[in-house]
């Protein structure tokens, strides 16, 4: 069956035909047959250079030989035990060694579960109920943060099914806005348990913090006894060996991880200072548990991945990122497109917006229809990126310089189509 037929069949049994909404792009998503290295292949016979990379986990590319071999070996001796394993200790040591804020770590099943658990832990540690997030930030599909609101006011649900009383415990302020954050904390800081933030906002495209903003956030949270949680589900092990906190030089109280920590398999983690982490059950009164937490297959994939990520690895990946971003900038300059390319490390995106993008409102001023033309044109040129202006694109170690050159050439064509100079 072809992708079009499979999508129709899928909609009979799976809501919307997909297991996550962003995958349901028009007119229908392509269905994958296999993937290897930097390439992904669909059932229709097409091959793509993949810059979606499962939305970030695959920093080594698809089906990395070492990961495949060692995970396959683990499968032969069991896929779940319901008991601790030595490999959990090995992976925990890797995390603690790499992440500056990590003195202890707890493994869970996803990034969303990690953020939910970290927020609960922050509330348990501080004895306070309210939390702060930034507009447009995504911290998983749970009730604590799937909310929206105006600065200084309690949030309202961002989806049906979340009680208003739950949303009222969350505040949301614009990213990169020191004044709005300061005003809120001055108003209600005594009741705020934590501030959770994506260091780089990777679920609204790719928005970096302004110079000095992270230092400001760290200082004001410390001064007001508010725990600072870095959501590094995307940036953890992506930007540097020690994540975005190493990359930018600011250390939080707690860190949440997902994606890369599981080496392409379902896995999340949250880590932090020992005095905070020891409040988690069974040591302390903050409950957290899961049948598949610390699953041996995911743990092995995490070990097999992290062991390959040394400092030279990140230098090479940054070089690739700079190469592609430089090529994109040259295309934009030569053609005079009034758009904004962004990115850092091995992350990149183009906002179809002439102005700099510093926050959620700026991002949503982008031309979504033009982006859609760009996305579809890239597919025709054999390059796959996430089908949304508000996701980030990624580079893996499996991407060759030839791949990146081809991607740049495809972007040049796709921009011509987007601006109706071609196609």
Curated annotation (Swiss-Prot):
Pathway given in the UniProt record: Porphyrin-containing compound metabolism; protoporphyrin-IX biosynthesis; 5-aminolevulinate from L-glutamyl-tRNA(Glu): step 2/2
Enzyme Commission code(s) on record: 5.4.3.8
Cofactor needs: pyridoxal 5'-phosphate
Keywords linked to the UniProt accession: Cytoplasm, Isomerase, Porphyrin biosynthesis, Pyridoxal phosphate
Transmembrane annotation, as ranges: none
Catalyzed reactions per annotation: (S)-4-amino-5-oxopentanoate = 5-aminolevulinate
Positions bearing N6-(pyridoxal phosphate)lysine: 259
A Pfam family of this chain: Aminotran_3
Domain of life of the source: Archaea
Protein localization: Cytoplasm
BP term (GO), one: protoporphyrinogen IX biosynthetic process
Residue pairs linked by disulfide bridges in the UniProt entry: none
Any GO molecular function: transaminase activity
Gene Ontology, cellular component aspect: cytoplasm
Record InterPro entries: 4pyrrol_synth_GluAld_NH2Trfase, Aminotrans_3, Aminotrans_3_PPA_site, PyrdxlP-dep_Trfase, PyrdxlP-dep_Trfase_major, PyrdxlP-dep_Trfase_small
Alphabetized PANTHER family for the sequence: GLUTAMATE-1-SEMIALDEHYDE 2,1-AMINOMUTASE, GLUTAMATE-1-SEMIALDEHYDE 2,1-AMINOMUTASE 1, CHLOROPLASTIC-RELATED
The family this protein is said to belong to: Belongs to the class-III pyridoxal-phosphate-dependent aminotransferase family. HemL subfamily.
Identification of the protein by name: Glutamate-1-semialdehyde 2,1-aminomutase
